[in-house]
Amino acid sequence: MPVPSHVSVATLQSVLQTVCSTGEPAIIAPSSFLGELDTVVDEVKRHGMKLASIPHGGITILPPVPISGTELFDFCAEYCKAQTHEERLAVRHKINNHNFLMQDPLLRMPCRQLYNPADYVLRIVHLCSELVSASEEEYHGAYGVAPLLHINPVQDVCGKLRSMFQSGSLYVKPWILEEEEERREMDESNRGVLFNSDSFGNGRGGSSISSSERSVDENDVADEDLTGEEVVDNATDTVVEYLSEKDFDVVTESGIFYDDSGERVHAIYLRGGIKKELCQRAAIAIEEAATTKNLRKAVNGGKTNPETGIVGYYDYLNNPTQRKCRETEFTRKNWSSVVDSCEPFLVALNKLYSECAPTHYKLQRIAIPHHYQLFNTVFSTMTVNRNFRTAVHTDRGDFRSGLAALCVIDGVFEGCHLAIKKLGKAFRLETGDVLFFDTSLEHGNTEVHNFDYCWKRVSVVCYLRNGLMSQICEMERRRWLQKQMLKQRLLDRSRQSVINLNATDPNLPPIYLPGRLLEVLSPVQQAALGFVVDRLSKGNGCVIALTMGLGKTLLSLALCYSHMYDQNPRDVLILAPKIVLTHWTGEKQKWEKYGLVFSHFVVSDGTDSVSFEIALKRYKQQLNGELPRTSHVFVINPEYIRTVLKKLTGFRPSLIIVDEGHRVSSKGSKLKDWLEGLRCTARVILSGTPVQNNAEELYRLIGWINSDVHSVLPPRVFTDLAGTINRYINGDDSALAAAVSAQRYIQEWMCSYVFSVMKTDLPPLNDYIIICGFSSIQRKMLEDHFGMEGIDGLTSIKASEHRPYHLSTHPLCFLGFISGVYKSLNGNHKLTPEAEEELESQEYASQLYSLTEDDIGLIDECLSLVNSGFLTEFVGLSGKMTVLISILHSIREKKEKAIIFSQYVGSQDFISRTLTSFDIVSSTIRGRDCHERRRRTIEKFREDEKITCLLLSTQIGAYGLDFTAANHVILWDSWWNPQVESQAIARAYRRNQTRAVIVYRLASEFEDTIVLKTQIRKLALFRCIMNEEASRAVPPEELLDCVDTEEDEGRRFLWRSLKKSYLEGGAPAVSKVFRHGDTVRSESWS
C-alpha cells in the first residue's frame, strides 16, 4: 500500500490503523519529508510495529511480529529440517494452532483485526526456509526486495540458520538455545553488575549497552539498522575545495595557538606526544574500521567515498533505528582486539590532554556519561581515517567546550598536513604526533607529496559526541536501567520502600526515591533526574529547560528527596518567585501520599510570618548545637533572600535550585552576588524559557552554573555568534548560512549543560492572532489623547505606556483609568512591580487629565445602554469586547471552559462586570488574594459546570497553576516578552490535558500589533537557540488570513461571523485572523 511522500499526523494514524487491521505492509517515500522521519519512527515504535528501509528511497511499515525470537527460531528450524511434505504440513498445523499473544493496539481501530497472525508467521517461516541454503548473491538480492529481512527477530533468525547450514550444524535442537540463554542471564545476575558485558567486565570503563540489552528484549535489538548501513557523519554539504600547503605556514615545533585576541585556544600541537609503539599497536586493531561504507563523499572531493570509520560509541539520532545511542558495528564485532591494543593508546592520549588543556579536559570529564567512556577516558568516539585527504570542512556534533585529539598512528607518506584556515597554519603530523584542536573551525588536509607512489597514512581523531548527552540518549539509558531493575525484581520489592534508580550500575551516582513515586514520574522526568544527579555528582550544575507543563516542580522535589537521603544532614535552598510559592507548597502536599515527605519544608514569601520565624529560630539552634541537626528545605522568595541570609549566618546549602531561573541571567543581578557568597557549586536552574529577550541570557545562565565555560568560549565570541543569528532573524537573508553555522555551534555548545525538552506529547494546540477593529469613538479618543489622526501614525510604544491597552478594552475602561476610578480596586496590599507601575502611570495620567463634558456624556450614554438592555450596542464600542462575547458564547454552547489573561486590573474588572451583564458566569483571581481564597476559586472553577471562564492577571496567573479544566485560553492584551504568554498558555496546555487547546490572542490594530512585532522577533530567537531550526520573523504583509482555510467548521463559522459583525461607526469587529505559528518561518538545519 503506497503512501504519499508528505505524511500528516492524521494520514499517518490512518496508515497505522490499516497495517494493524489488515496485516498488509505500507510503503512510505521519505524523500520530501526527512524532517518528519523521527515522528514516523516514534509513532511506529510506540505502536509496536516494525520499520524496514526498503524499497530504495522508501520505508516499509509492517505489523508487529506476534511471536518471540526463540519461538520463531524453533518453527523455522523445524520447518527447514523437515524432509517430506507431510513433515512441513505438520509444522504449518502446529503454527496454525499456536496461541499468539497479540498486543492490544493503542490505536482506535475502525474494525476488528482482519488477518490471522499465523499467516504472518507462516510467511516468515517460508521466507527463511527459501533462503537458508541460498548463495550470498541470491541472499543479497532477496535482501534488497524483502522488507521482512530488515526487521528483527526475522533478520537474526535467518542469519543464524544460514550460519548453521554453512557449518553443517543446522539441526541444533531449540532447547539448547533456551538453556544457553538461561545460563547467560544467570551468570550476569551472579556477577551483580548486569550492566557490564563481557567486553567491559574488567572495570576499564564504558559499558556495552547493546550486547547486554539484547538479553532483556529480543525484539529491541541494537543491531537493527533500518537504513541498511550505519549512517555516520553524513556530509550533505556541497563539495568544497582542497587546501594547498603553499597557502599556509607549516608548523613543525610544539606549541599552543590562540585566536587573534589571545583568549581562546584553537590548537595545541605536540611532536612525539604518543610513543610510536602504542600508535602502531592501535593501528593494527582499528585500521580495518576504515572502509568506504560511509556517506562522506563530499569531504573527499565528491568523487568516491573515503576510507573512514567509527570506533566506540555513536549517536544515530538521524537514523530510523530502534537504538539511537550505542556502539558501532565494528566495535561490537571486534571489541576484544580493541581492548588489548587501543586502551594503552587512549589512556596515554587522555593523560596528555589533561596536562596540555586542563580546563577543556575538566569540562569534558564533567560532561561525558560514564557508560560512554572508552577506558575511563574523556573520549567516547574515534574516527579512523586511512589515506583520506579531507577537503575543507567542520566537524558536527563534537563537544564544543573541549578539543578533539588528532594523532597519526601509522603510515609512510609525505605532506598531507592538517591545515586550519582561520589560523593560517598547517601542522605536520607524523606517527605519534598529536594535535588537539577546535573542530568547529574550517580545516582539511594539504596535498600528499608522494601521491603517485605507494603511500599509507592512518590517523585517528578522538572526541566526545554531543548527541550521547542528549535527552534521547538519556531516556534510552533510563529505560534500559529500568528493564534491568524489573529483571532483578527490584521494582516489585520496592513499592512500599525507597529504591535507588541506579542500583543496577554501581558506577552511577545513586538516585533514591520512594517506590510509589515511580508510578507517576514520566520518562522525561526520570531522564532529567538522571542528567541532574550525574552533573551534581561531578561538582557541577545544569539547566533544566523543560517546556511548560512537563512537571519541573515534581522533578525538583524528587531531586531534593534523593539529595537529602543521607545520614548526614543536608540543606537545600530553593528560590522561587512569590507568585509560585503557593504552588510549591501545594505540590509538596500533593506528593506526600506517594512517599515524598520532608521533615522540614520551610516556605516564606518575605512577609512577616510567625511560623517562619519559629522555623528559623529552631534551625539556628541546630546550627549552634542546641538541638539535633536535621535536613531542611528552604523555599524563599528571591526578593527576601538577603534578609534571610542575614538572619542565618553560617547557612551553607549543599544544593541551590532556582525556579524561573532566567532571572539569574539579568545583567548586574544582585541575586547572583548574594548566592555566590554561599559557596555552593551544586546549582540547578529551572526554566521553560531560558532564552527570553536575547541569546546572551543563556550564556549568563550557563556561566553561573560553571564559570569555566567563559575561558573556553569568551563572551566576545558568543556575542558575535548571537549577533549573526539576530541579523538573520531581523530580515537579513544574506546572513542565513552564517546564522545556521552559529546556531549549530550554540546548540552543540549548550548540549552538555542544558537538559532540554521543548516538544510535548499533548493534544493539538490551535493558536490564533485575531486583529480586532476600533470603533469610531475609540478612533476619536486616539486622536484626542494621543495626537494621531489614524492608527498607522504610531510605529513604537513605550513599555510603561498603559493607556492604549485600556482604550482598546473599551472607551469607558479608558476613561476610568485616566480619571483614577480603578485606583480603589488596588486596595492597600503590597503591589507587584507591574501593578505599581500601572498605578503610577494611572496617577500620572489622572494628574494631567480631568473628565470633560463630552467624556461625562459618553459615560452616561454607556450606562444608559447597559441599563436599557442594549448590551450589543454597548460592547459594539470596542472590537475586543465584541469578539470576546462571541467567543465565550461559542465556548458556553459546547459546555467548555476558558481562562482569560490580562495585565491590567482595570481591564480585568471591566471584563468581569460586562460578562455579568451577559449572564456569563465567571470567577476572578486577584494578586492580593490569599492562598486559601485562590485555592477555593480554582477548585470551584474546575468543579462548577456553570462557570464558563476564569479571569486572572497575566503576570500572576502565568506561573505554576494548573487549569487543565479549561481548553480555551484568551490573551486579552499583548506583552513584550512572548515567554510570559507562553507560560500563561501552559496553564491549560500541559500534562493531563486531554482535549485540543485553542488560544485566542486578541490584538488591536494599535498597540498590540506593535508589541507583537517585538514578540515575534524574540520568539524566532528562542526557536533558533532551543530548537534545531533557522527561524525568522515573517513580515506582517506576508501573513495570510486563515479564515477561509480554517479546517475546523465551528471556528471557520465564528471567524466569518466576526468579520461580518460591525462596530459603532461601521468598522468590522475583526479584520484578519492569523495562525500564530505562521508568524515565524523555520527551516530545519539538521
UniProtKB/Swiss-Prot annotation:
Dioxygenase that catalyzes the first step of DNA base J (beta-d-glucosyl-HOMedU) biosynthesis by converting thymine to 5-hydroxymethyluracil (HOMedU). DNA base J is a hypermodified thymidine residue found in the genome of kinetoplastid parasites, which is localized primarily to repetitive DNA, namely the telomeres, and is implicated in the regulation of antigenic variation. Probably also acts as a DNA helicase. Recognizes and binds specific regions of the genome, hydrolyzes ATP and allows the DNA base J de novo synthesis. SUPFAM superfamilies: P-loop containing nucleoside triphosphate hydrolases. ATP binds at residues 546-553. The gene is JBP2. One of its GO terms (molecular function) is DNA binding. This is Bifunctional helicase and thymine dioxygenase JBP2. It catalyses: ATP + H2O = ADP + phosphate + H(+); thymine + 2-oxoglutarate + O2 = 5-hydroxymethyluracil + succinate + CO2. Fe cation binds at residues 393, 395, 443. Residues 1-518 are annotated as: Thymine dioxygenase. PANTHER family: DNA EXCISION REPAIR PROTEIN ERCC-6-RELATED, SNF2/RAD54 FAMILY MEMBER.
